Amino acid sequence: QEDAKNSQNDIINFIKSSSNYKNLFPFWGTNCIYVEIYKGLIPELSKLKNVKKIDLEMGLIQEIESNSSKKNNIFFDENGVEPGIEAINVRPLWEMGYTGRGRLVFNYDTGVSSNHPAFSERFFANFYPMSQCWDGYFSPSPNGLNDHGTHTLGTMCGLVEETNDTIGIAFEAYWIANDFVTSTVEELPPVVDMITSFEWAFNPDGDLNTDFD
């Protein structure tokens, strides 16, 4: 955070010296600045020492088909492993002990059915406040309105212990999530909120002195 702050000082001071801007948001997670600024200032801004790139927010993302009206059928295969997992040859890593144990993953997607048996017991909110485990933009608590996020979280860390059906890569990892991905571009949260969600995931409890999260 300190490195980002130091490298952004001159840029922020330049922006603030002009009255032709609004909505200035500095970020440390990716060391960037979001600002709505008069286009005539962009050439001057680009000449500043610490400016590597200036990009225009286009708001483009691949649309995801909504599955909210479809029945979410769950099938378990005893001692099974998903073909995609076999395809990336992850077994040698598992045999070395790399199973996600003691790790925390972040699912940035459409939301999650937190009671899904493949990962419900490893939801971080079982142990810590919901504010540190769920960053909801559309819903204050985990939801499964669109099953895309539930599917991708399963790919990340799913495991049905009763049948030993291994769905995910890091099948012993704990997880946190958000619901920022939508089915249409028009429904997307502002880019500022999307970047902020990643910064939240870097430090969910807001305390730089803790590392469990």
Identify the role of each PLM range.
Residues 7, 41, 115:
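Short phosphate-engaging motifs
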Residues 38-39, 191, 196:
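Charged, often glycine-rich, active-site loop that binds/positions anionic groups
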